[in-house]
């Protein structure tokens, strides 16, 4: 009787034969460790995609190495040419800003803002607000002009008043008096100077 078909009875004297024979069977570890294929892909397609993925990853690593080497070479050339880091930074910022300006997102945003601005300026509320502000400005200008005219008229009335004329006459009188005294003082200077020119008499001899 074959051992595979023996009765697995705990009370049977041959109860250890089946387990001993199963331990001798080799196990395929490769099959057990293999992951199941992705749903919808055959094993061949999966292997092909994995090979392509490995190739792309290797190309990415190579490109990064090439880029790093190019950047080092570029930095060395700039150093030898005397180009400062600040100049390179400005150039990079300028290039980045240009890239932003020509990007689709920036262009769409600018167009959207232009549309909003046009809608706002064409709206009735904006027009009414603009008209109100214009009218307020005109009223303010008219009020300032009226106030200036009133001040000028008031000053004219003050100059024509008796009080102002009396004050003006007093100022004129004081001015005339000051000028007259100054002229009289200048005329008296030669006489005093003339008396000073008189020669002194010789002292009497002892």
Swiss-Prot record:
Name the residue ranges with Basic and acidic residues bias.
Answer: 175-185
Coiled-coil residues: 38-82
* Disulphide-bridged cysteine pairs: none
- Domain of life, per lineage: Eukaryota
User: Could you tell me the keywords of this UniProt record?
Assistant: Acetylation, Coiled coil, Phosphoprotein
Q: Which InterPro entries match?
A: TPD52
**Is Acetylation given among the entry's keywords?**
yes
| Phosphothreonine modifications at | 163, 173
- Region Disordered: start and end of each range? 1-24, 175-206
UniProt biased composition (Polar residues): 1-14
Cellular component terms per the entry's GO annotation: cytoplasm; perinuclear region of cytoplasm
Q: Which residues carry this modification: N-acetylmethionine?
A: 1
Residues with the Phosphoserine modification: 3, 12, 19, 21, 96, 149, 161, 166, 192, 195
Recorded hits in PANTHER family, A to Z, give: TUMOR PROTEIN D52 (PTHR19307), TUMOR PROTEIN D54 (PTHR19307:SF13)
Q: Which family does it belong to?
A: Belongs to the TPD52 family.
Subunit-level organization: Forms a homodimer or heterodimer with other members of the family. Interacts with MAL2.
Designated name of the protein: Tumor protein D54
């Amino acid at each position: 009787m074959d051992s595979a078909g023996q009765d697995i009875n705990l009370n049977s004297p041959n109860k250890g034969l089946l387990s001993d024979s199963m331990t001798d069977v080799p196990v395929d570890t490769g099959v057990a460790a293999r992951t199941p294929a992705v749903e919808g892909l055959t094993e061949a397609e999966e292997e092909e995609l994995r090979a392509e993925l490995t190739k792309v990853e290797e190309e990415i690593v190579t490109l990064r190495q090439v880029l790093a080497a190019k950047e080092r070479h570029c930095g060395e050339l700039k150093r030898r040419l005397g180009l400062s880091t600040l100049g390179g930074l400005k150039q990079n910022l300028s290039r980045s800003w240009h890239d932003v300006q020509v990007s689709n997102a920036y262009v769409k945003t600018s167009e959207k803002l232009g549309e909003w601005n046009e809608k706002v300026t064409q709206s009735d509320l904006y027009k009414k607000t603009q008209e109100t502000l214009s009218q307020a400005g005109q009223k303010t200008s008219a009020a300032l002009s009226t106030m200036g005219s009133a001040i000028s008229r008031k000053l004219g009335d003050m100059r024509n008043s008796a009080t102002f004329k009396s004050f003006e006459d007093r100022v004129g009188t004081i001015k005339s008096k000051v000028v007259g005294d100054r002229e009289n003082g200048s005329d008296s200077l030669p006489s005093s100077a003339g008396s000073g020119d008189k020669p002194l008499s010789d002292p009497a001899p002892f």
